[in-house]
Amino acid sequence: MCMPCFTTDHQTARRCRDCCGGRGRKCFGQCLCGYD
């Protein structure tokens, strides 16, 4: 299971989405992972 990730860093956000199998969402410049 992917841990929640809140970041405005582009590189970190991309890794976050990759960790979540591409299901990470961009919300107000942040990547929210683990919530689907």
Curated annotation (Swiss-Prot):
It holds the Pfam family Toxin_5. It is found in: Secreted. InterPro entries: Scorpion_toxin-like_sf, Scorpion_toxinS_Cl_inh. GO terms for cellular component: extracellular region. Disulfide bonds join 2-19, 5-27, 16-31, 20-33. Expressed by the venom gland. Its main location: secreted. Keywords: Chloride channel impairing toxin, Disulfide bond, Ion channel impairing toxin, Knottin, Secreted, Toxin, Voltage-gated chloride channel impairing toxin. The protein sequence was deduced by comparison to other short insectotoxin sequences. Toxin with unknown function in healthy organisms. On glioma cells, interacts with chloride channels (probably ClC-3/CLCN3) and MMP2 at the surface of glioma cells. This complex is then internalized via caveolae, thus inhibiting the chloride channels necessary for cell shrinkage and tumor propagation. The presence of a 'disulfide through disulfide knot' structurally defines this protein as a knottin. Belongs to the short scorpion toxin superfamily. Chloride channel inhibitor family. This is Insectotoxin-I3. It comes from Mesobuthus eupeus.
